Amino acid sequence: MKFMSATAVFAAALSSVTEASSIQDQIKNTDCNVSKLGYSTSQAFTDMMLADNTEYRAADSVSFYDFSTSSRLPRKHLSSSSEASPTTEGVSSSSSGETDEKTEEELDNGGIIYAREKLTISESQDSLSNQSIELHDNSIFFGEGEVIFDHRVALKNGGAIYGEKEVVFENIKSLLVEVNIAVEKGGSVYAKERVSLENVTEATFSSNGGEQGGGGIYSEQDMLISDCNNVHFQGNAAGATAVKQCLDEEMIVLLAECVDSLSEDTLDSTPETEQTESNGNQDGSSETEDTQVSESPESTPSPDDVLGKGGGIYTEKSLTITGITGTIDFVSNIATDSGAGVFTKENLSCTNTNSLQFLKNSAGQHGGGAYVTQTMSVTNTTSESITTPPLIGEVIFSENTAKGHGGGICTNKLSLSNLKTVTLTKNSAKESGGAIFTDLASIPITDTPESSTPSSSSPASTPEVVASAKINRFFASTAKPAAPSLTEAESDQTDQTETSDTNSDIDVSIENILNVAINQNTSAKKGGAIYGKKAKLSRINNLELSGNSSQDVGGGLCLTESVEFDAIGSLLSHYNSAAKEGGAIHSKTVTLSNLKSTFTFADNTVKAIVESTPEAPEEIPPVEGEESTATEDPNSNTEGSSANTNLEGSQGDTADTGTGDVNNESQDTSDTGNAESEEQLQDSTQSNEENTLPNSNIDQSNENTDESSDSHTEEITDESVSSSSESGSSTPQDGGAASSGAPSGDQSISANACLAKSYAASTDSSPVSNSSGSEEPVTSSSDSDVTASSDNPDSSSSGDSAGDSEEPTEPEAGSTTETLTLIGGGAIYGETVKIENFSGQGIFSGNKAIDNTTEGSSSKSDVLGGAVYAKTLFNLDSGSSRRTVTFSGNTVSSQSTTGQVAGGAIYSPTVTIATPVVFSKNSATNNANNTTDTQRKDTFGGAIGATSAVSLSGGAHFLENVADLGSAIGLVPGTQNTETVKLESGSYYFEKNKALKRATIYAPVVSIKAYTATFNQNRSLEEGSAIYFTKEASIESLGSVLFTGNLVTLTLSTTTEGTPATTSGDVTKYGAAIFGQIASSNGSQTDNLPLKLIASGGNICFRNNEYRPTSSDTGTSTFCSIAGDVKLTMQAAKGKTISFFDAIRTSTKKTGTQATAYDTLDINKSEDSETVNSAFTGTILFSSELHENKSYIPQNVVLHSGSLVLKPNTELHVISFEQKEGSSLVMTPGSVLSNQTVADGALVINNMTIDLSSVEKNGIAEGNIFTPPELRIIDTTTGGSGGTPSTDSESNQNSDDTEEQNNNDASNQGESANGSSSPAVAAAHTSRTRNFAAAATATPTTTPTATTTTSNQVILGGEIKLIDPNGTFFQNPALRSDQQISLLVLPTDSSKMQAQKIVLTGDIAPQKGYTGTLTLDPDQLQNGTISVLWKFDSYRQWAYVPRDNHFYANSILGSQMLMVTVKQGLLNDKMNLARFEEVSYNNLWISGLGTMLSQVGTPTSEEFTYYSRGASVALDAKPAHDVIVGAAFSKMIGKTKSLKRENNYTHKGSEYSYQASVYGGKPFHFVINKKTEKSLPLLLQGVISYGYIKHDTVTHYPTIRERNKGEWEDLGWLTALRVSSVLRTPAQGDTKRITVYGELEYSSIRQKQFTETEYDPRYFDNCTYRNLAIPMGLAFEGELSGNDILMYNRFSVAYMLSIYRNSPTCKYQVLSSGEGGEIICGVPTRNSARGEYSTQLYLGPLWTLYGSYTIEADAHTLAHMMNCGARMTF
């Protein structure tokens, strides 16, 4: 850099100087020839000479030669243009006389201060006293706590300050360091040791620049910023071209004055001498300098010459920030290389800082905000968790840009923790990691030789001829290497990082933060926001990932190994996008765990587009006047603030020129043009900054309309610069010198063109491989890879420079040159995706994976996983059944792909979900219209797509999902094996899903074992709208399984998602619910597919499943639930039913005329073959209740246990039928059980049941009272065609064998149920280039279990049981006369009928209705029927059951017990606690009551039990000193139960009662002897109660399936009067007391009249029970005390004599017959005993707890009464 052409440097720099109006008038213009060192092309330019303020202007073409340079540019006080601050007066500095003795190091470093020792600057001017410094300028401003360093230039390092030791700023209120420039490093401050800012209130480093690095501050050690309020780094720049933008008008004037101040005595060497010295250096005479002297402007300098790193701060070690109470920000800093805000060779640590901000910084390479070679960490230690306040601190990275990786941060490891807010927004990168990049090891290391950094303090390293080059610092730059270059230290660090990363932990850690927002970041390759290896985001209260985008994979996050979200409060990820995979998240392993609240992934998109005419995105319109290109290189300039339009245009022109005549190019530019270009630059800079969008991935083009597109894509290298700029001249090799002297016109190059190449080399330094790929990640329309020539039509204009660049052996990560084969994971992409142990709800909504290849193009991409794509495993488990995850509106779609489209919401080979989920309106569609049917693959898995296994165990709801195959769940493997869809536990609902071909669930194996499974109103174009399986299926109901309303129709009128494929032929589509078809295209497999139906814990029902030729043609509907090559097995537990309201129309692969050749259908077969009585004893039911049901099952049916029920007019056609012992075949009127014509099969019936209840009243068919069921035999006529279902019903077998055969020949067998021409679907995941085709998986043929039947015969034996459970048959008036009734139709051919020991049982003698008897008519057995003879007796409305009528009367005893229980509580508790000797008081009582009464059966009464419970509230007071009066209200609820075992009926009643009571007490003395005044103390207590009791009773009669209801009321009175006397009074210190008492108790209960309802009702009259008893007893009282607690206890026993009672008598009458009588209630005996115990616990003067228990017993009755509660005294 030191020995570049002075002319080339000055030509561009000082053109700006002449634009300054402040000096223009002072300068006179003179045209002349000027001689300076170096060479250049001739061009109109303006240069400043060093004498008499004369401006010399050269016009037209001038050859420059014999240049001279000064040995040194002496410093001038640049403050001469403005007055120095008076506050600097007195500060010591070197005298002017000592200037010549200063070293060049001191003169060239430190624009204001050169410090030899530690430099400390505070707010006082005295801070500079007594410090070993060289003060070059007295212009430092000190005043009122303010310190200013501004507008200074250093020819080497430290534009304002240079320190050989530590530099410290401390205790300053306001520090302003602005517009200082260093030609090398440290625009404002350069220090060889630490730089510190401590205790500074306000610090600003603004618009400083360092050409090589450290635009603001450069430290060779570390840097510390601590205990400050606000620190600002704004508009600083690193790198030659970047520094140019720091110039302002004042700085230009100062530079002009500096140039003008060169004194003639410093020019002590002649031009000839200088030229000779220069030539000598170029010839290699100097070891230190000649290499650099010999370099032409196109040669490669050492990396440090073009460092361009650290626009704000550069440190060779670490940067530490701590204790910032306000804000530390890095705003609008620029670096032509890396780290526009901060560049540090080691770590960046920020602790206890209120706000750290990186805003609008721009880097030409990596780390637009910060580049940290090792670890960047930001944390606060004020709080340990987000729930422990205060949590302070914010980190903001916003609108930072990088042309390489990491628009915001580029580091090896990042840690953000214990913060209030983290915001990453609108950052962008031309490579990967729009906001954060942490994979430094993946950045290629250039092979460009490195040179050691020249020491700025060494005189030997300073050339003698440098002044001219140093002044023009802004433009002295050279070409950058081909790939991002790293210094040797960085290279070593990268190697160490790469080695240790294998075992490293997390490189992106964001934890314990209140709010994290990652929004609107973009990258041209991977990771729109974050790119790294491992990331963990944990303990975050709110996390938002929104609006990020990438042009490759991972629109939001891209991690090469793993990403983990742990303990997130609220997670929102929406509107992220990527071009290939992972719209929001892309990683090898994705884990979401312990999420505390709702997590949402919404409207994320993966979208790839191939267009016939590429267009720029609408959201980024081209800048006015720029040339639109088809594709733009990701590495082209996006930084409007650093883009010189004219310079970039020159670069493009030079590249296009190649080896042509550059003089023609030179003539295109003028002085005016240069000035206009500078103005355009400023306008373009502002425009680009304002118009740049956060989601933009397209570069802003240059305004020069003549530039070629390869200016964006060409990679500038050392060799390319030389070859393109020198025509025919040799490039210096191995330090060889270029030809000196005056070059020819052909060999010369314009200054601006040279500078343009230098600028391009310093900014456009991405790898060559990037230039060959299109920016847009598109899928190729052919099998060949996308190349640069195909994507960029102008790439050929790059000449040999691009062609000579070495291509890397591997494409860099994110390259889109390969053919795109997968588009997937609209929200999440990973090899393994796990979402576990979350506490809130989950939402995946509106995510999309789209192949938008336009029509006319062809795509082979697979489009998989609209919301989630997992390459190996997807696992969803909340750990709780109360958490739900919803997948709604997710989509995979394609316009033209011949690849696979699958998994509208989720795609993974293995899917495991163990939490409740909802899948709604997800879809997988392929709308390709430019492919043939053989090219287009069927989509599968509208909600879930898989190839290995799907397991759901927490319940799910699938609603309105769409796909070709498996509209809800599609499992399509490459090779048909045992891949299973398994639904376990929970409840599952499949509703209104639409299959454009087949099935809601499509899989080889389907296993359902659920509490609830409902398939409702699902639709398909072909068979099996609910389930389609190709290997095996098992459905087990633990609660309820229902298939209803499923529809197969050729027209899906409501479907708008794509055009369904048409079917060939008019084929009947049986199997509207379930269809099984062998996965074999040639049909060679001979085994049928097992389908097992198990009703173990609930019912299974098929109803209204329909095939409809057109959606509106309901008149030709066929209702069929199951079809296909299916081998059925059915099991139903006791009390459970498998119901078929639709027909079964299965087919078979078996052939032959013998029944043994066909499969066996086992009904209720025990799992243990040795067990005779199976655990499955439930019912299998076929019904025509809803519509015709003619079922055809080509199997040998064996009924092992339970019941097979054929409802009226239902037909079941099987190969053969065998009924095992203990089972039941139930047939109803009009039902048919038949064999089929395909084989010789027999019907073996043992113990048949005929249900008569479905016969309508007055129903007589052809002289018979009902249409009898039929056992039908059909001769074998087809030669064993496979048992396909018949479309027409066979005729009744009332004709001979010939007619029977004619009516049931092969023509009646109809079409095959599996006659559809569409092929079975095979795999797509493992073989994506093939269409779905059934895989030929041959399995060994198994021999069906042989049945022990005789061919084509009905063998009937055992009982024929008649049942009429509802009693409807015998209510038919047709039975009022004797007659013969046909019960069963049999074959008329006696050879086809065997009857053995038939017995008629069941309802043959009805108890109500038309009563009579039925007997078997043996004469009709040979006539093809079984008939009975009916003998009419009489008509009876009700069946007679002898009833005991005592129950209603006995309930009076329960009512009396309610009254007594309340009385006992009032006397034993409330009155016994009364203390009449105390002062007046009031009591509030709250009590709980309970009673239980049991009575054993007696000759006059039934056994019954009664119990009740209730509550009571009482209030009493002392109106007088010795009188207590109170009132109480009680409510009781009771139940009565009576079981009459011998007559098999039960009474169950319930009662509730209300009682009101008053009570009182008074002590008095009974005078025994008036003379002696001897008296007996007595206590009188009394209670009066009134009660209302309501009864409600139901009586069940199981034998006749009837019941009675009775409701009545009781009214009750109870009066009790007790007198007691103390026999023993307590002595001193003794509390024992003995009392004797007597009581008079009277009760009266009156039962009101009532009438029963329902069965044979009775009327009951009033009855009353009265009882007068005299209890007499002895009571013992005493107290226990301790720990200030007093417990008083009382125990008494009494004998109770009933002196009067009546036996209640109730009259009744049976309304139907008029019969009547009297009921005498069984009352207790007259003598009984009663025991009482009560206790009181005194808790103080106001509160008392109490309780009492009473037991009463006699010979037949036992009663328990309890009362407990609390008393409050007030």
Curated annotation (Swiss-Prot):
Its main location: secreted. The keyword Metal-binding does not apply. Residues 1477-1770 form the Autotransporter domain. It holds the Pfam family ChlamPMP_M. Keywords: Cell outer membrane, Cell wall, Membrane, Secreted, Signal, Transmembrane, Transmembrane beta strand. One of its GO terms (cellular component) is cell outer membrane. It is a peripheral membrane protein. Transmembrane segments: none annotated. Belongs to the PMP outer membrane protein family. Disulfide bonds: none annotated. The keyword Transcription does not apply. The lineage of its organism: Bacteria, Pseudomonadati, Chlamydiota, Chlamydiia, Chlamydiales. It is found in: Secreted, Cell wall; Cell outer membrane. Residues 73-109, 264-311, 481-505, 611-818, 1271-1329 are annotated as: Disordered. Residues 268-285, 631-675, 682-703, 1303-1319 have a biased composition (Polar residues). This is Probable outer membrane protein PmpC. Residues 85-97, 294-303, 496-505, 719-748, 762-802 have a biased composition (Low complexity).
